[in-house]
Amino acid sequence: MDNWITARLAGTLRSAADPLVVDLGYGATPVTAVELAARLARVRSDVRVLGLEIDADRVAAAMPAADPPRLTFARGGFELAGERPAIVRAANVLRQYDEAAAARAWLTLRAGLAPGGVLVEGTCDELGRLGCWVLLEQGGPRSLTFACRVEAIERPGQLAERLPKALIHRNVPGEAIHEFLAAFDAAWDAAAAVSTFGPRQRWIAAGTALARSGWPVDVTRTRHGELTVDWTAVAPRCSA
């Protein structure tokens, strides 16, 4: 997720009046916030990363890693501690919520963004091999990105287990996300011959095939094991 943010949201960060980025729910250790700050500093030297946790003990434990003003930590949740960040990163934060509560959290987080700001919300496995995230602007979701270590998957459909809360229960017949994942698996299967050159080339070929068949996908970062699809192509169709 961090590499994608650095590459795809560099323009958002560079144009921000206040280059504040929030790492929401960084966890038991501040590693993700530390790494995010280091990566984003290469995009904009005056970036400020604020790690937020609702657990005061986690905030206290992170303090030795603080490097103000570049990296700070505070207690806070979906209200973003009253800040107006240009970018919010929320990884593995909403999985424990039900779909309705997660939708409310999206609304709260989007309302707290600075003008032109974005929210990146999603999940990944413990080893960072499989992940999915949604890019949201103040007006709503814009895209869904699938990411993996291509050597770790047998088919792209495995990423369904990492879908964000808004979609994870929608991977059923009649829903757009189900159709997209079926098409992705079919494109992967059709690219079997390319696997001679490695799984990365097979992933690239599958993404290219999806684009050619009319799916609104961005294949710019397929060489990195990522594929982004417009939210309109996968958004929920049926009432929860």
Can you name each region flagged by the protein language model?
Residues 176-240:
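Conserved Class I S-adenosyl-L-methionine
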Residues 84-103:
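A short SAM/SAH-binding and catalytic strip from SAM-dependent methyltransferases
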Residues 95, 103-115:
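A short glycine-rich, Lys/Arg-flanked "PGG" loop and its adjoining helix->strand segment in the class I
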Residues 70-72, 86, 117:
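Short, conserved active-site loop motifs that form the nucleotide-linked donor/cofactor pocket
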Residues 27-80:
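Class I SAM-dependent methyltransferase SAM/SAH-binding core
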Residues 1-19, 23, 28-30:
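Class I SAM-dependent methyltransferase Rossmann-like catalytic core
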